Each structure stands twice: as C-alpha cells, then as structure tokens.
Design a protein with these regions (language model features):
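Beta-strand-rich N-terminal accessory domains
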Residues: 1-97
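Non-catalytic C-terminal accessory modules of carbohydrate-active enzymes
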Residues: 59, 65-73, 78, 82-92, ...
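Aromatic-rich carbohydrate-recognition surfaces in CAZymes
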Residues: 77-106, 172, 299-324, 387-512, ...
Length: 760
C-alpha cells in the first residue's frame, strides 16, 4: 500500500488516510512535475536544514553552516533503485551526464548497463517534519519514501538533534522474485564548510552499518539500520554512469566529502521491505558572517552541548527511531483530528513549523556572548529571512512569530527574552536586532545588538514588541518569578516609549517620535504625528505593563498607565476617527493629514484581546471600520487585504507613496492578524475565510515551504522563509475564545499536542 493515496487533487486541501495514522489526516499534495519553489526542510531547532524537493533532489542546505548565502540549491538526486542492471534514479529531473546512454563494462565480463531512467512523476505530501513521497516509474517495484527529522513539540533536547531518517518502502507487486539494489547518495560538506578537501572516513558497524565522514569543521554519518548487505562509496551526484551500475559497484572514494550507501534486496512476489537510512551531521561552530569563511565572530551551536559528535547523534536516532516517529505521528494526529479547526488550518499549523529549522540558531554561552548569559540558556535567535533580509532577532519578526516557541519550546523563547533584556539600552530602549544586515553587521551575529536603522528606526514600536513577548511568556507559564525578573525592564521601556514625543503632550502617547524620525513596521513610507496603528500598539503595551505593575504591587506605575491610557485613547478617538475609518495619520502641529486606510490598523486591538485585556479602540468603531476594510482593502485583493488603500479605491501614484507595499501589496502575517480580529468581533466565517484565501494563494504560487513577507507589492513576492508567518499559532487561542494562555491549559490544543508527543 502507498503511504498515502496518489490520486488526490494537486495543491488542494483535503482529508485522506495515511500510513501510521489511525484517523484521516489533513493535507495537500504537490507533484514533482509541477513542484513548489522549495520542498520541505528536514531539520529541527538550531540544526540547520536540508530541503527535500518534490522533484526528488536536494535543495538548499544550511546543515554545515552555509547560512547566508545558503548553499544550493544543490539539485542532485539522492535515491535510486536498480533491478536487472536497470537503474531508476528517483527524480523527475533528468541527469545531465551521459543521460540516455547505455554502456558496456569490459572489466565485468562485458556486463551491459542500461541507460538510467528517471521517475515520470513524484507525489509529495509534506507534513513537517515528515515528507512522504510516492514515485511513479515503470520499475517492477513500487517505491515510496518517508523522510523525517526529530521534531517533537515539548521536547527541546530531541528537537535539537541534527539528524534525519529516510525510510524507503519497496513493494513487489509482480508474480516473480525481484532482486536488486537501493542506493542513497549525499554530497557532504563543501570545502568552505569543512575547511578542507581531505576527510577521515571511518566504517561503522553494529545496529547500523555505514560510514562516518569527518573533518574538523563538519562531519556526518550515513548508515543503514539493521541491514547485512551494505556497501559504501563516493557520491553518485548527477553521474548517470555511476548510478547505472549501483548493483555492482559504487564510486571509489578515499578521502572525499560525498558518500553513497547501497543495500541489496530480494523480494518474493507480493513482499514488501522497508530500508532505513540515517543521516546525522555535526558542524558545531558557525561564523557570524554567514559562511565559515566569513568575517564575523565564531559561535558554538547549542546542539554541540547536548551531543558529542555525529556518531553520538546517529546512535541515538538508530536506537530510538521507532519511538520518535511514533511520537511525531501522535502529536500530528491531535491537530489533524481536531474538527473544531478547518482542514486548511490544521494542515497549516503543522507545516508552518518548518520555519523553525529554516531560521533558528542557538549559541552557547561562550564568548563572544557576554558573561550575563546563563550556561543552560545560551542565546537563541531566529533569522528574519536568511536569503532576503538576514539578521538575528529583528524584534517585530519575533513579535509576530515566536508563538510556537513560547508554546512548545519555552526554554528557547526565554533565552531570547533574556538576551533582549541584557541588550536593552540604559534609556530603556529595546534593541532592534542582535546583529545583521540592516545595521551593517554580519548576518548571523548574536552579540552585536543595535537600536535599528541609522535613519528612521522602528524605535516607536520595538518596545511594544518586547513588552508583548514578556507578557506572552508570563501568561503562558503563570510564573510570577519570571514577571519579577523582567518587570523593571518592561517598566523602563514603557516609560521610554511613551515619552518619544514629549513636545506634543498627550498626543505624543499615540504618535510618531519627535520629528517623525521613525518608521512603522510597515516601513518605507512616511508617517506624521498621530498614527492610529502606532497609537493602538502603544495603548496595548500600556495595558500589558499596567497588569504587570498591578501584579507586583507598583501602584504608582498603575496610576501612570491609567493616565496614559485615558489621554492616549481620547486623542485617538477625538482626532483620527473619520466616520467610517481611522485616518492614516494626523499631525496637529503642521496640519498634515491622510485619509488613507491602513487595513492592519487594529494590530494593537489584536494584541490586547489576545492577551485577555480590554481592547484599545472603541468597540463600535472597530466594528464599523472592519466593515469598511471588508468593502475596500479586502475587496481589492483576490486573496488577502491590501495594506493601504483609499476609502473609494486603490491608491494612485499621486496620493501617497506606500513604498514597497505598492497599491496592491498584501502582508500575510498582518492579514492573519486582521482575520483574527474579525473572529474577536464575532465574524468567524469572515476571518477564517480571509486567512484561508491568503494561505491558499501561498500554496497556489508554490511557496508553502518558502513563505514571503509581502505579496504583489512592488514585486510579486518579497522575502523568503519569513518566520513572521508563525503568527498562525496564535489562532488556537482565538479559536478557543480565550487569551493566549488558554491552549496551554488542561485539554487545550497546545497541552494535548505536547502530551501526545511525550506519551506515545
């Protein structure tokens, strides 16, 4: 039986039965002949990853610390099967070397090796961290593969293991015995990653058989579990001749980086066999410059604190592979089986977690990390967009995207918060990044914090992000000791943020900083004076800070927060309400004013309500403007909500410059937050449909495992692997009709996912 039905529609969410699952799953199928831009990555937290393409080749690779620029796409096939001297390379991409040529090996008694064949198609179901593939060939066997990485919500140590397993299912549906060979190929690290072209190769025997390929900077192990007839050799790559003779020989290798491993098999009629390959890697040090030859500082991966080397990882996986896969299926089954969520959202909640291996990095508490850092914490960070805007912990990105970390890996989220606190400036200002491209430092630095852009930084919103993330952790854990640890930092930032425009009196609470020398999250456009989007975020920050002050008994600051709330709210409502919507901005000092609609104006409302607090705008006006947004910004996009528009239609060039958002740009994370705001106000169908159409467009365009930050702005897409999209994991709290902590309580979705993954 195949791992999943192969006759399902392409790129359409549906439910179906699948191998190992007791109930129907939710998912969508891609195909190798119409492949997505990137396949699903294999990896965990801080491990780097290797993209497994729907075409049956390796894609981008960061496992050996080619972080920026990424190595790849490698575009080499990795799996092939041979029966009767006929090899099928299991990829829809034809080999470039000697394709279509037969040849005779005179050294093997004139053995005739037939021209290699490729797969005519591949059916591909990604359900991170698992990718299931079914291959279409004319071979006398049917072949499927389940590839997976150890990613278990709630188990940070196991999810920190740099490894992947490839389970290849061979099925003989003929009436005769089929003998042959299955071969797996891996290129290993390149010279820049390894720092050498000479590798030590050590044979591995025991519960698994294969080879360890070692260098000072990068090593890996490739083995087959429980097989007696195993051969190893050099990388097969794109060499059709090498693939064609895998039944008899593999490429000679003495000290090279690449490896192939072959397992011989014999299947009686109707028989099936599963051959399991383990790939474990170990590249303990990365350079903040993004590549190992970069000019940044060196950091040591947290996984190197847990595991001694690649062989230790491989041995652990070999001994526990059945348990780990069972646990993965168990936690996924909780999501797939919860009929309170629409099918598309169940699948998206599973697959959006792929952004964690694509963007996460975790430094040990060793120099250049300061001595403020606890050994057990290290410094965990996410990279905004490794291939487009590489920088660590851009604070609004984590504001959008750290929900699954808070829920499933709070150790990592707390590590990040402690770094933000350590890097906070004496003024109370929060750091913008830990290091990276927008501030002129290398792209993977963890200890080069900066307040932001040299001109017009996002300072006015950075504090709201920081306070929100602290409140998230407090609400999720219920730990008042954590609150006490961060309270002074939160208070100092809130005071700093509310005094960025002291010359405007009460209006300064909900305005741009003095001189308008700042940017909104929706950057690259000019805003002036009172800005409802910024004001709403400020008021949400104050509400959170007030609750914290109340909890620690700081009544004086409670009164200060009450004063800010009353004054700021009065200014927003009296100065910027235009009857059907809030203005984009209004600067009383100069008379500058814009009637343009910003469809994501209610981000602060979403923040407050998600945290179980009273909203920050008048509820009746929120409802009125949500209706305005529906007939304008949402109506103008076939799949989302445009960021900016006029009350009567699209922006013209003469109206105002929206920067790279253009007249039709959509921000997927912002659209998801807007969708949840509709849910907060009782419009569940509207909100879920809006979010579904946005995610559906991402799927349609082949970006499911390569999600952008902007669609149809000044370019069809802006950004790759944007972890802001992890904001999807705030949907469970909204769907459960409660605050951010609700999914963690007994019987909540997060609670059930963690328990299933630990108990299976």
């Amino acid at each position: 039986m195949p791992l999943f039905p192969t006759d399902l529609p392409e790129r359409e969410w549906c439910q179906f039965n699948a191998e190992g699952f007791s109930r129907r799953v939710c998912g969508l199928i891609h195909r190798g002949t119409n492949a997505p831009l990137c396949g699903m990555p294999l990896g965990g937290i801080d491990t780097g990853c290797l993209d497994l393409e729907a075409t049956g080749v390796w894609g981008y690779c960061s496992m050996f610390n080619s972080l920026n620029p990424r190595r790849g796409a490698i575009n080499e096939p990795f799996l092939g099967a041979s029966v009767g001297k006929q090899t099928w390379v299991l990829s829809t991409v034809a080999l470039s070397r000697r394709e279509g040529q037969e040849w005779i090996d005179t050294m093997r008694s004139w053995a005739n090796y037939r021209a290699v064949k490729s797969a005519s198609d591949i059916h591909y179901w990604g359900h991170f961290p698992v990718a299931d593939l079914e291959y279409e060939t004319d071979a006398p066997l049917s072949i499927g593969m389940r590839a997976w990485a150890p990613f278990i919500p709630g188990d940070v140590a196991l999810t920190n293991a740099p490894a992947a397993v490839f389970e290849v299912h061979l099925r003989n549906s003929t009436e005769t015995e089929q003998k042959g060979t299955l071969a797996f190929s891996f290129p290993g690290p390149n010279e820049g990653e390894a720092g050498t072209t000479a590798f030590r190769r050590v044979k591995i025997e025991g519960a698994a058989t294969g080879v360890s390929v070692e260098s000072p900077q990068a090593s890996y192990v490739l083995t087959a579990i429980g097989e007696s007839s195993v051969r190893t050799g050099g990388c097969l790559g794109t060499d059709a001749v090498a693939w064609s003779c895998i039944e008899d020989t593999l490429p000679f290798v003495e000290a090279g980086a690449g490896t192939s491993i072959a397992v011989d098999f014999a299947l009686s009629p109707g028989a099936e066999k599963t051959i399991r390959f383990v790939l474990a890697w170990f590249a303990p040090v990365w350079n903040g410059g993004g590549i190992m030859t970069g000019k940044g500082q060196d950091y040591r991966h947290m996984y190197a604190r847990r595991y001694a080397n690649a062989r230790a990882v491989a041995e652990m996986i070999t001994g526990r592979h059945e348990e780990i896969l069972r646990r993965i299926i168990a936690w996924q089954s909780v999501l797939y089986g919860d009929e309170g969520y629409p099918v598309w959202l169940r699948d998206a909640l599973v697959n959006v977690l792929h952004l964690i291996p694509e963007t996460s990095i975790w430094a040990q508490a060793k120099p250049p990390v300061g001595d403020w850092c606890n050994e057990e914490d290290g410094v965990f960070g996410m990279n905004e967009s490794p291939r487009a805007c590489p920088q660590i912990e851009c604070i609004p990105c984590s504001f959008y995207g750290n929900f699954p970390l808070v829920y499933f890996f709070p150790e990592a989220a707390l590590s990040t918060l402690r770094a933000y606190k350590a890097y906070q400036y004496p003024s109370g200002q929060a750091p913008w990044v830990f290091g990276g491209c927008t501030v002129g430092s290398p792209p993977y630095e963890m200890a080069m914090p900066s307040p932001g852009y040299a001109k017009k930084p996002q300072t006015t919103l950075d504090g709201g992000c920081y306070v929100d993330m602290v409140d998230r952790m407090w609400r999720r854990t219920g730990d008042d000791q954590l609150l006490r640890e961060f309270y002074d930092s939160v208070k100092r930032n809130t005071i700093f943020t509310m005094n960025l425009r002291p010359g405007s009196g009460a209006a300064g609470i909900v305005s741009m900083p003095e001189g308008n020398q700042a940017q909104d999250w929706f950057e690259s456009c000019d805003l002036f004076g009172i800005v409802p989007h910024i004001g709403g975020v400020h008021l949400a920050q104050i509400r959170m800070a007030r609750r914290m002050a109340k909890a620690v008994g700081d009544e004086e600051f409670v009164r200060q927060c009450d004063s800010w709330l009353a004054q700021g709210s009065e200014v927003l409502e009296n100065e910027t309400w235009a009857g059907t919507h809030y203005l984009l901005f209004k600067e009383k000092e100069t008379g500058k004013e814009s009637d343009i609609i910003m469809s994501y104006v209610f981000d602060g409302e979403w923040m407050a309500k998600l945290h179980g607090l009273e909203g920050v705008f008048r509820p009746d006006r929120v409802k009125t403007m949500l209706e305005t947004i529906r007939r304008t910004a949402i109506a103008m996009s076939p799949f989302g909500s445009v960021v900016f528009c006029k009350p009567e239609g699209a922006l013209g060039k003469e109206d105002w410059d929206p920067g790279y958002w253009g007249a039709h740009g959509v921000h997927p994370p912002g659209t998801f937050m807007l969708a949840m705001t509709y849910l907060f106000y009782g419009e569940k169908d509207t909100g879920l449909d809006l979010a579904r159409r946005t995610m559906g467009e991402i799927v349609k365009r082949g970006w499911y495992w390569d999600v952008p930050v902007a669609i149809d702005g000044t370019a069809p897409r802006i950004g790759f692997d944007y972890y802001q999209n992890l904001v999807l994991w705030s949907f469970p709290a909204v769907m459960e009709g409660a605050d951010i902590a609700a999914p963690c309580k007994e019987g909540g979705l997060v609670d059930r996912v963690i328990k299933a993954g630990s108990e299976a």
